[in-house]
Curated annotation (Swiss-Prot):
It is an enzyme of class 2 (transferase). Transmembrane segments: none annotated. Residues 276-302 are annotated as: Activation loop. One of its GO terms (molecular function) is ATP binding. It comes from Arabidopsis thaliana (Mouse-ear cress). It holds the Pfam family PI3_PI4_kinase. Its EC number is 2.7.1.67. PANTHER family: PHOSPHATIDYLINOSITOL 4-KINASE GAMMA (PTHR45800), PHOSPHATIDYLINOSITOL 4-KINASE GAMMA 8 (PTHR45800:SF21). Signal peptide: none annotated. ATP binds at P108, S109, G110, L111, G112, G113, A114, K129, Q210, R211, F212, V213, D278. This is Phosphatidylinositol 4-kinase gamma 8.
Amino acid sequence: MAVALDPLTDRFSQFSRSSQRCRLQSLTNLDFNFLGFNTKQTNLSASSHSLNNRSVSTPCFSISGSNLDGSATPHIEILGGQRVPTVRSLVAEVTIAIVSGAQPLLLPSGLGGAYLLQTEKGNNIAVAKPVDEEPLAFNNPKGSGGLTLGQPGMKRSIRVGESGIRELAAYLLDHQGFSSVPPTALVRISHVPFHDRGSDHAAYKVASLQRFVGHDFDAGELGPGSFTVVSVHRIGILDVRVLNLDRHAGNMLVKKIHDQDETTCSNGVGAAELVPIDHGLCLPECLDDPYFEWLNWPQASVPFTDIELQYISNLDPFKDAELLRTELDSIQESSLRVLIVCTIFLKEAAAAGLSLAEIGEKMTRDICRGEESSSVLEILCNKAKASAVSGSDDDDDYSSEWNEVEAELECGIFQFDDEVECKELPDMLQVPIFTRVPSIAANLSALMRCPPNQWISTYDTNIEEERRDRSIVRSKSHPICVNYDEKEGVYFGDMSGDEWEMFLHSFQMLLPEALEGSTSKGPKPRFGSSCKF
């Protein structure tokens, strides 16, 4: 069966051999703001005066938007990543499979809807994850749904329906395939039978599409001694940059190398490479608490190699942020600021000689005496933000400030007086809840036929008052990052451009002394570790 890719639209369709007249589409700009799908496509051949012809030997097909929408033929449109050759190749393979009649297979693992796509011969090609079937989403096929797109999800700093763009963002940020993230795209798939709560299948769905990676195990089935230091370091470097909130053993695939047998690999003899997948819970809207499964693995304590240090040194957080603005301009600016802060922290920490484990520790919150305390990175950001919004940059004594921070770190818990310390915080650190849903949520909600009146737009004042009555007052930030029983994060999206510049200046002034004056306290236990030791 012949399938072609149109260079203007990245759409695929079967050839129509009944017509030799080409119907051309006007060149419109794709709306990366996710995807305002109501954009009308112009069919220049609609005019009777249009006599544009190709060679009569070339079978032409209609790429008219109206014809595609009215046709029951499966097809795919690339919405994000279309400039990347590996993405276009992946989508071409998947398109050939689905127009040949391949059916998506729902995978039993995981909380969300993930579908395996195969060729006619049964070879695995890719895994598709519709955004309306994410964990907690209203169309979840595994009974864990109920929320509309745009509401806070499993992590309060990442909204339901926004995991797909983060999957693509992680791939775009993996320069030269350094961390081995599989090719990933964001696509609109039409007339393919995914799960739908209604009696009829939806005409189309937006989904992330990631190339399937053949593997022997996941990291949870082996002890960490089986993995190469290089693989652990490269995954860790990516996780730190994007502040991965969910790097557990199940989303690191294990590939044996050097033709090792299963017994050798499972006994921890030799080496195995890791492939990271599932990046839907990275780039949160605020500085949240990450989870790094590798934090206590011995490989993470090994110093970085010269190649790794050179790669880290060459990272440009501002160019990375601009890349995501270009490819995914619907991603929140606050998430891009998290990327910038974490990348700067990684670069400075690596240059100061810290290992991956030490860097991860300083980004991770600790639990002491049943209470969760702020991470070193959060403390730094809170102080830098307070300095920026108050405009007292020039008068700050950075050395004395960091001495106070070190004293707080020794205690392990931050207990402040509600009536004194909290009132001294600048008003801008206590900003209200979002009064509207970001544009991506609105567009996707419309796409999935979610009534706008179901979007989250109010805040439970009773919950807020209860939080204020608690004796343990934690770092103030944007309330969208607050779960009822979770610690708040540091929110950067409420700062103006000038304040953001002042924040970065203050942050970079505080950072060297913070890294120099703090020492690793050794590995600390992490709940949920699934690897053998």
